[in-house]
Amino acid sequence: MHTEIEITEDQLAIDWTLTDTDLQFIKNNSNQNIKFATQMCYLRAYGRFVSKDDVIPYAALSYLARQLDQTFSSAPVFSQDHHSYTQREKIRTYLGYTAFSNKEALQLGEWLVSQLRKEILDKKQLIEMAMTYLKSCRIVLPSLITLGRVVSQKVNQAIEGFHCSIAETLAPSLRANLHHLITPEHKEAYAQLAELRTSPQNANSEVMNKYLDYFEEIEQLGILDCNLSAIHPDVIRELAQKGRYYDAVQLRDMASKVKQEAIIICFLHETAKTILDYIVFLFKRILLDTNRRAKNEISAEREKVSRKNKGKFKPASDFIKSAFSQAAVKELTLGQFVTQFNEATLLETASACEAIDKLESSGVTDHIVNRFSYIRQFSKRFLTLKLSASTGLASLLKSIELLRKLHAGDIKKLPEDVPTDFLPKMWKDVITDENGQVRAHHWEMGLYYALKKEISAGDLYLSKSRNNRYFWDTVYGELPWEQEREQQYLKLKLPNEFDTMMEVLSGEYHQVATHACNTLPTNDFVTIKDGTFHFTKDDALVIPPEVVQLRKLIQSRMPKVRIEKLLAEASRLSGCLEGFTPFYEPEKTVKFPLKPLLAAILAHATNIGLFGMGSSAIGISIDTLTHASHVYLRPETIKETNRRLVNHFLTYPIAEEMTDGLYSTSDAQRYPMERKFYLSSYYPRYYGYYEKAISIYTHVSRGGVFGTQVISTGEREAPFVLTGLLENDTLLNPEFHSTDTHGFTEHLFAMLYLLGFPFHPRLKDLAEQNIYKIDKMMSYGDLDEVFSGTIDIELIRANWDQIVRIVASLKNGLAPAHVIIQKLANRTDNVSKAIRAFGRIIKSIYILRYIADQELRHTVHLHLNHGESRHQLAKKLFFLNRGAFKTSDYEEIMNKASCLSLVSNAVLVWNTHHIQKIVDSLRAEGCDIQSEHLQKISPLMFKHIQIYGTYHFEDI
């Protein structure tokens, strides 16, 4: 394989420029000056000599020839004969390089050990670092095979040391129990370890207790007491991942017992965190569902009472009005007055009023308490978890301890002075009976809802979990922040003092508010009515006829292609399949399973499934499909493959013309679920109350998908906006981000702005949006009646450093972005309020600009339309079984969603490759194709793609 190295002009000037001394040295030592000079410059530039497989760029040879005042007709040939060796030795000595011998190998080994102590275990990364190190030491690089062998040897030794260290954290008596996890009880059974890999199928008491059992089993094994602090978290995560992918047979058959134990320990260590997060999610979800069910039941009862008592409320109204009018003139005694009305009718009216009042005042809580015995099926065990709390929740912790004693039988009833200050308002109103005594069941249910609230805010927490830790443990700690503060402010390009930023924002606010005020009389988009904005027209983006015609013309010239051929060709064009690596390091070189891997990707992306693809594909067996899927398809490998596809797409000139890289968008696409799944929920808008669904939330820029997340349709989308943007590892570099209206909160406006992604959502519910002044003394004419208040600037100023601390934590991935955003939304401390206040500044500026700037609105609509084009393609690809998921396993769902994004990106690459040819051809024919028209055409057209039928992999 021949390798041509790209050389920039700067590299030519630095490494390929010959000094007078160089020229004299070349003249004195060689007759073949260009060949000799090339070897010398190559060693200087890359730390090694030219090999027979290297191709020297013409620019470098031409540059050397000019300096040597010579000409050349062909590239020199570099051989390995004795004369060439002598020449290389002269060059090595002249440049002060040392040959790579045993001494240098030992030196490299010592250096590698120093890097391994820093927990750098990636062999590719270490090889690149070793090459840089050897060059800095002026040691001639050995062959890649030799270098790889040295690195592998040291890495394997280090990993073996880690295995021993990890295994020794567990007592020998407990280590023996690990073997039971990978040994089935009988031939047909699954090993217990396999059960721990599953995700919850539903949110109910049975599933809750099942996962509490799992956690207790891990706890009893002593895993939570293992001190792994000396092991780098990346090492633990890597070994834990192997525990997820190795099956029980592979683990049992491992030659190294220590490696087996280390993998299982790390897997259990990380799985315990996941299970705790599942338990908390289920706890909150069950309470949420119970509350929702109670509200629905109350709504139905309210309608029933209203129908039953139709017309019975008027007598009460007449009675009251008459009482006040006659009392005013003192015409009748009370007895005379009452006899004017029918007693039975009034009593019926009173009963109806009492029924309505009971429903409104305590109906929801009474219905929730009716589920008390159901909640008790798991709540006792939930309270045995090691819950901790911030200093302000002392009474809640005291109440938890009281309830634990009550559950254990240590006390018979709640004390009279039981704390109630922590209860949510709806429970405080109903906590006592008519005698003023605390109602135990109401108090206990109120406590559970208080737990839900405080866990969501991160003030009540489980320190052993991953996402439900103390809020301030998910961001920079106080000491690390003191050390990092100065550097992080510089990296974020944020001022140390808030007043510096406020000066800029004040000027921008005044400018856009003044412009919005001045243009309001002629604004045909919105008007002000009853103190709120109202749309006066549909401001949808109009696509010119020329664009429609051009789209049809390009579509008509697109070659017909089957989806499997498209995927194979896009993979070849981009080299993306190099991103797929096996989850284990094979003992010997294995052939890359190209066809089975392509078929497995399509099986997931089309929802056909592996067995379905095995039946529909020619040249592929089900065994090879399942092997390729299990060994190669993982979140990190699919993400890497997607990265390569997107980056290749950006190399086409037409990509710059057709797509505006300034914007990215994100949106959720709903898919029905045929199996029970803990993230699924009803989505009446599309599926009524008969079928549950989940959302696949994707981030798109220039048509390329760079983020894929599986979320619940019952959750707000806003927290997941930031996750995709911060985890983007492609060359896409959007400056603005857009979503639909439901995709934002004031916290999100603040965080996106401070992280360098100004937020431009589409506003559909403008009348429901509040905007605020930053200076209550300023007047903006007719706009004054829509302002909801004045932003507390002093609050932001006082908490500015803490705000930046959270922003820096998000930027550096200290915790998943959606976790921090969700906690912020539930917190009521001053820092959270300050972030919300800052978000109100940014949101107010944006809304005022949005209503007055038609070009901004159309730009936002255009990019969201491109995102919608990707949704249409995804719907077309994911066709089987009505696009419904038939699995309840989170990883399988995530694999399907990620492979769908991968194939979508493959379509983008393939289409762009051919659109480039078509547009070039049309322009050569004299067609005037404007870039502004191309930008209104999505490259994700798919009419030419054949998706259904038999899949032919035999000739790929």
Description of each model-found segment:
Residues 737-747, 765-770:
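Acidic, metal-coordinating catalytic cores used for nucleic-acid/nucleotide bond scission
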Residues 585-589, 605-663:
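Electropositive nucleic-acid engagement tracts
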